[in-house]
Amino acid sequence: MSVVVATVNTEGGISLVADSQVSDPYSKLNGYPDKIWAEKDSGYVIGSCGSIRTAQVIRFATDWPKYREDEHDLPKFAILEVVPAIKAALQQHGLLKDKNGVETMDSGFIIAWGENFFSIEEDFSVLMPIKGRIAIGSGYAEAYGALGDEGMWSLDDTIEAVRRSTLTAHGVGGDIYFITTNELAIESVENV
């Protein structure tokens, strides 16, 4: 249970913003900043919702493919190169699941770089941002409601969408962290 929101930023690039609450069936903990991170070698920024273990394996064990605009279109790259790289890391660490004959994972992700972004869902389906924004996790509906359909959005707009999700969505809370494809550095909203 979480919320991660990515938007096309009015200042260029993509903003990725997340809450910091993690939970298990018996408790919750606020202040976990590792729902978002930067893969500095590839220039990707990534946000995750779901299993912490799955996110850790994807973060530290995935051999990220390099996107080259002259060789790939974005959906094809995501489906044929990124998804298999993630599946390979999960398989290697025993986290690739089979649900009624469909390979699954217990997390969802947003991956962004430059002006590009998409989400990978639990069944490895890839969703492209139709209106310049993507939200995942239990707070996604509140975030979409706060953003509306007309973008681009400032970083502050995206932070506000996550803040609103912390007020009403189950399993969303704690401090808010952000990263942009321009900066590749995680910051707390308190430090802005």
Predicted regions and their residues:
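Conserved short S/T/G-enriched processing/targeting/catalytic segments and their helical context
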Residues: 1-96, 102, 127-159, 172-191
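Long, charge-patterned amphipathic alpha-helical coiled-coil/hairpin "stalk" segments used as oligomerization
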Residues: 102-135
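C-terminal catalytic subdomain
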Residues: 163-170
